From Swiss-Prot:
Any one Pfam family match given in the protein's UniProt record, by short name: peroxidase
GO MF entries: catalase activity; heme binding; metal ion binding
Active site, per annotation: 97
Site keyed Transition state stabilizer: positions: 93
Name assigned to this protein: Catalase-peroxidase
Function description: Bifunctional enzyme with both catalase and broad-spectrum peroxidase activity.
Family of this protein: Belongs to the peroxidase family. Peroxidase/catalase subfamily.
Crosslink feature (Tryptophyl-tyrosyl-methioninium (Tyr-Met) (with W-96)) location: 223-249
Gene, per the UniProt record: katG
PANTHER family: CATALASE-PEROXIDASE, HYDROPEROXIDASE I, BIFUNCTIONAL CATALASE-PEROXIDASE
UniProt EC number: 1.11.1.21
Length: 732
């Protein structure tokens, strides 16, 4: 995996697409793309509009599926024979690589949508031969149809693979509905598979600082290069890469060691011959290959002649049974550098006999082998301490691996309310961002009206109520279903201290809302209560209603109680730190100047909030006139009547009587009267993009028209309500 000029596993053939002219992105490469806001619509979904995947999965006979999967494990097929007569190792890799694309920085990747079926993941160099794994599963997927998604089946198969080889897993949850097109995800800027860190489009800067939010060391890898950094077989240097990439997938050192050791107890790698024998990836291969790629001309191209990573390593004496060989071999043998038949760097035990079975010839044995990244677990001091404990206490390894595997394969599913099936563990885990179950009677319509009155007479301005509710709810990420207003974690560390949340103002606001909450709860004779999480959202609703009335268009903002307040003990501070916004165009906030323009960061935020382009547009316009910017900045507040929910932002942005010029401050513009030159407004790139970008201008013109005030208010309320309820999986 060290070739920089051209990856042997990348496509060199002719693509199976008709010829076409340049796209808009070709002509204008810096043009803002709104495509991320238009993914996964009903237009690409073959299911009936009323199809309910959760209901379908709950009707599934999971035990029967698992029985079929158990049978498949040892049903070796001639077209792709099973190593050691068991597909377990292959299926563990398939599930691991499906889940392992997850990254905590933006929550994207992971196993939750079955994205391994689509480009680019289906053709990544690190996923060679996983096309065969999914094809082996097709008869089972075909049998059970829409009752189990590919996303769920892939993870379930990994679990069954472990169980069939004697390992007790922690549990399994379904609930991952398939998508039907590739996610639009930034995987890096490299133009070459496996480009090295010194390349023209490197993801590294400074002292090997990995670009955010990426969580793999090279384009086309899941985590690290198993040969070492850029192919350098240095276990200590490799440990640094391992620690960084696994941390970016929300794994600590113990979980990392357990995953590597546990996963590498099974199966083998494949590097029977030179990579030059390997053909085109699935996306490039000819139509006759029917979605299968990497056809090899080395020997039979399969079985004993298979080439996948180019490495040829088998870790244990029983590759199809859970045992403790990984750490026994790691610590009890000394290791010397060698090369695989494909020329890749790997390690072989010194002065040790041939104890490792051959995958296809029972009469053959070989010496124990390991990867550079395996040796990192011995030669990195922190990893060594954990590894030695696992070596001395195999039961601790088994428990740690079962928990880490469960976390790996379920990390992007969000709260336990989304988990389905009979094998969901009862234990609540902190990485699931637990929230207490509702334990009181909920407020009714009269209570809601009374609380709104208390809120609006508290002295808290509309702008503060709106910005606080937005700050609470807009932490939600549709990528990994984390964040949101439920739990009221805005009052807990770390969110209460985030700069974007204006800690001093937030503390005062929450104190007043808590006074209202306490007064209401103390006045109840029964078990009726209002949570702070509900009250924060209700306060935002009351403020929006008042602002709409101020604009002459009274409206009712929907509100459904049922949120609860999480505790600090239920909150993983480090995990939430990764979610701190560095930009929020809805509040005109930039932590600092980035090499990505503010308008692109706005679209990225909107996509995480699952918003469409019209929803993004109406929310920005509304939040500006409600004066909800961080620090009460006046950039983009294009109105003379702030805190009235008017369409003034669009009217004034589109006013041809205003001339815009860049100001001295980065990313800030001044709007001057075209006749007098007098300063009228200031704005940022996240504002002016709605007049500059042709698609966004078309939307702005809808809301800037003279007949748009009422529809603007209704559309804003609908989009606002959507954001406030993004994490209400209990309402689904």
């Amino acid at each position: 995996m060290t070739t920089e000029s051209k990856c042997p596993f990348s496509g060199g053939g002719k693509p199976n697409t008709p010829r076409r002219g340049p796209s808009n992105q070709d002509w204008w490469p810096n043009q803002l793309s709104l495509k991320p806001l238009h993914q996964h619509s009903s237009l690409s979904d073959p299911m009936d509009p009323d199809f309910d995947y959760a209901k379908a999965f709950n009707s599934l006979d999971l035990a029967a599926v698992k029985q079929d999967l158990h049978a498949l494990m040892t049903d070796s097929q001639e077209w792709w024979p099973a190593d050691f007569g068991h597909y377990g190792g292959l299926f563990i890799r398939m599930a691991w690589h499906s889940a392992g694309t997850y990254r905590i920085g933006d929550g994207r990747g992971g196993a939750g949508e079955g994205q391994q079926r689509f480009a680019p993941l289906n053709s990544w160099p690190d996923n060679v031969s996983l096309d065969k794994a999914r094809r082996l599963l097709w008869p089972i997927k075909q049998k059970y149809g829409r009752k189990i998604s590919w996303a769920d089946l892939i993870v379930l198969t990994g679990n069954v693979a472990l169980e069939s080889m004697g390992f007790k897993t922690f549990g399994y949850a379904g609930g991952r509905a398939d998508t039907w097109e590739p996610d639009d995800v930034y995987w890096g800027s490299e133009k070459i598979w496996l480009e090295l860190s010194g390349g023209q489009n490197s993801r590294y800067s400074g002292d090997r600082d990995l670009e955010d939010p990426l969580a793999a060391v090279q384009m086309g890898l899941i985590y690290v290069n198993p040969e070492g950094p850029d192919g350098n077989p240095d276990p200590v240097a490799a440990a640094r890469d391992i620690r960084e990439t696994f941390a970016r997938m929300a794994m600590n050192d113990e979980e990392t060691v357990a995953l590597i050791a546990g996963g590498h107890t099974f199966g083998k790698t494949h590097g029977a011959g030179p990579a030059s024998h390997v053909g085109d990836d699935p996306e490039t291969a000819g139509l006759e290959r029917q979605g299968l790629g990497w056809q090899s001309s080395f020997g039979t191209g399969k079985g004993k002649d298979a080439i996948t990573s180019g490495l040829e390593v088998t870790w244990t004496t029983t590759p199809t049974q859970w045992n403790h060989d990984f750490f026994k071999h790691l610590f009890e043998y000394e290791w010397e550098l060698t090369q695989s038949p494909a020329g890749a760097h790997q390690w072989v035990a010194k002065d040790v006999g041939e104890t490792i079975p051959d995958a296809f010839d029972p009469a053959k044995k070989q010496r124990p082998t390991m990867l550079t990244t395996d040796l990192s677990l011995r030669f990195d001091p922190a990893y060594e301490k954990i590894s030695r404990r696992f070596y001395e206490h195999p039961d601790q390894l088994a428990d740690a691996f079962s928990r880490a595997w469960y976390k790996l394969t379920h990390r992007d599913m969000g709260p336990r309310a989304r988990y389905l099936g009979p094998e969901v563990p009862a234990e609540e885990l902190i990485w699931q961002d637990p929230i207490p179950a509702v334990d009181h009677q909920l407020i009714n319509d009269q209570d809601i009206a009374d609380l709104k009155t208390s809120i609006l007479t508290s002295g808290l301005p509309i702008s503060v109520l709106v910005s606080t509710a937005w700050a609470s709810a807009s932490t939600f990420r549709g990528s990994d279903k984390r964040g949101g207003a439920n739990g009221a974690r805005i009052r807990l560390a770390p969110q209460k201290d985030w700069a974007i949340n204006q800690p001093a103002q937030l503390a005062q606001t929450l104190a007043k809302l808590e006074d209202i909450q306490q007064a209401f709860n103390n006045a109840q004779s029964g078990n009726k209560r209002v949570s702070l999480a509900d009250l924060i959202v209700l306060a935002g609703a009351a403020a929006v209603e008042q602002a709409a009335a101020n604009a002459g268009h009274p409206v009712s903002v929907p509100f459904t109680p049922g949120r609860m307040d999480a505790t600090q003990e239920q909150t993983d501070v480090d995990s939430f730190e990764a979610m701190e916004p560095v930009a929020d165009g809805f509040r005109n906030y930039l932590e600092r100047q980035f090499n990505i323009p503010a308008e692109a960061l706005l679209v990225d935020k909107a996509q995480l909030l699952t918003l469409t382009a019209p929803e993004m547009t109406v929310l920005v316009g509304g939040l500006r006139v409600l004066n909800a910017n961080v620090g009460q900045s006046q950039h983009g507040v294009l109105t003379q009547r702030p805190q009235a929910l008017s369409n003034d932002f669009f009217v004034n942005l589109l006013d041809m009587g205003t001339t815009w010029k860049a100001a001295g401050e980065d990313g800030v513009f001044e709007g001057q009267d075209s006749q007098t030159g007098a300063l009228k407004w200031t704005a940022t790139r996240a504002d002016l993009i709605f007049g500059s970008h042709s698609q966004l201008r078309a939307l702005a013109e809808v809301y800037g028209s003279s007949d748009a005030q009422a529809s603007f208010v209704y559309d804003f309320v609908a989009a606002w309500n959507k954001v406030m309820n993004l994490d209400r999986f209990d309402l689904a």
